[in-house]
Swiss-Prot record:
Lineage: Eukaryota, Metazoa, Chordata, Craniata, Vertebrata
Gene Ontology cellular component terms for the protein in this record: cytosol; mitochondrion; nucleus
Predominant place of localization: cytoplasm
InterPro entries the record matches: Dimeric_a/b-barrel, NIPSNAP, NipSnap_domain
Name of the protein in question: Protein NipSnap homolog 3A
Subunit relationships: Interacts with the Salmonella typhimurium virulence protein spiC.
């Protein structure tokens, strides 16, 4: 009887532990959608920032002939100076591979922009991200400034912290002082990282809205819940370039 009871206990334990293990490492249904977004950051040499942007603007059509540019910004506050940040959309990984191969064979792109401008770049970084399931990419109503808020979450993915994070984001959206452009979850890069891209009319309107949100009980309650899953956070103020699709 004791042996039978021990065996039954082990069997029941294995059945209860299995779902916990799955949920700890699940990353959510976003993976079933092949579309992803590549975040690219170029850290430029201080004296070469304007030259780089002017050169890209002249040759942007050569690059966008191969894949869709979502937005292109310069970092104003909150990050390394003389940095450009841009987002590219791909249908799937095979699509990106095809694009990179085509760019390598595109003599105009190579000779008119890439090769002459490599010397202007000090460092490059890339992340692959998916939109979270409850968010679609939105275009702001007019020109403004952007905030990229980055949250390093505890391991576990959206299955663990997704609902609480969603409530915190929507609490800010519902106040109406800012517009949500997109919420992205990393697939390659620093894992368990979420990027929230916001649009504001100006840096001052954002500041006023944030002060208001800090006094709103709905925002306070939602944020208190979501911070239980938070490791760290940072943000950057981004200024769209003249050739950025997102203004």
């Amino acid at each position: 009887m004791l042996v039978l009871r021990s065996a039954l206990t082990r069997a029941l334990a294995s059945r209860t532990l299995a779902p916990q293990m799955c949920s700890s490492f699940a990353t959510g249904p976003r993976q079933y959608d092949g579309i992803f977004y590549e975040f690219r950051s170029y850290y430029l040499k201080p004296s070469k920032m304007n030259e780089f942007l002017e050169n890209f603007e002249k040759n942007a059509h050569l690059r966008t002939a191969h894949s869709e540019l979502v937005g292109y910004w310069s970092v104003e506050f909150g990050g390394r100076m003389n940095t450009v940040f841009h987002i590219w959309k791909y249908d799937n990984f095979a699509h990106r591979t095809e694009v990179r191969k085509a760019l390598a064979k595109d003599k105009e792109w190579q000779e008119q922009f890439l090769i002459p401008n490599l010397a202007l770049i000090d460092k490059q970084e890339s992340e692959i991200t998916y939109l979270v399931p409850w968010c679609k990419l939105e275009k702001p109503p007019k020109e403004g400034v952007y905030e990229l808020a980055t949250f390093q979450m505890k391991p576990g993915g959206p299955a663990l912290w997704g609902d609480a994070f969603k409530r915190a984001v929507h609490a800010h959206v519902n106040l109406g002082y800012t517009k949500l452009v997109g919420v992205f979850h990393t697939e390659y890069g620093a894992l368990n990282r979420v990027h929230v891209l916001w649009w504001n009319e100006s840096a001052d309107s954002r500041a006023a809205g944030r002060h208001k949100s800090h006094e709103d009980p709905r925002v306070v309650a939602a944020v208190r819940e979501s911070v239980n899953y938070l490791v760290s956070q940072q943000n950057m103020l981004l200024i769209p370039t003249s050739f950025s699709p997102l203004k």
